[in-house]
């Protein structure tokens, strides 16, 4: 009712349109069944009838916590179901690409990013020296968080975004995805005292983070994007 009272041009959805968190949704028919159940909701049907929607997937459309190492057959099934049930036009030159951009004159450059399917494996929040699962080789002193080779976007998508950030003259630039971009520390290890007498393993910007599954687990890449965008004007 509140949305109906607004003069909306479109709705943006950043993912988790469905949420698969079990081990039983495996095939294309399984994923299609989940979408059919969700789309039977009359309120959701009314939303789609009233407004166009700009969408991106998160992990809920696949299985909780996905990354580029997801089992390929299951990933392909989930991806195909998403394309079938969501309002997305597949690009002719690259039918598997989902990151894309929209422009409204010189007012706004509106990008949508895939921060799930191309990313490196997440880091364990409580132990930033190791990768998930914990059987992986430990990295010293939180090095995994600040590893410059770790990527959330993947090389092709990152290059595409960096180019867009310096292309065109827009009043606003919107970068859409399902993660908080700011650092969310539970404990800040980067203090004046630590800088004056660095303990073993000290790292500038170090801390205990709320979730290193998000951008706090891909610190170097986030910094690279901030530096690229710094001369430009970004929206809130």
Language model features with spans:
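Long, structured stretches of catalytic cores involved in phosphate-ester chemistry, encompassing
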Residues: 1-236
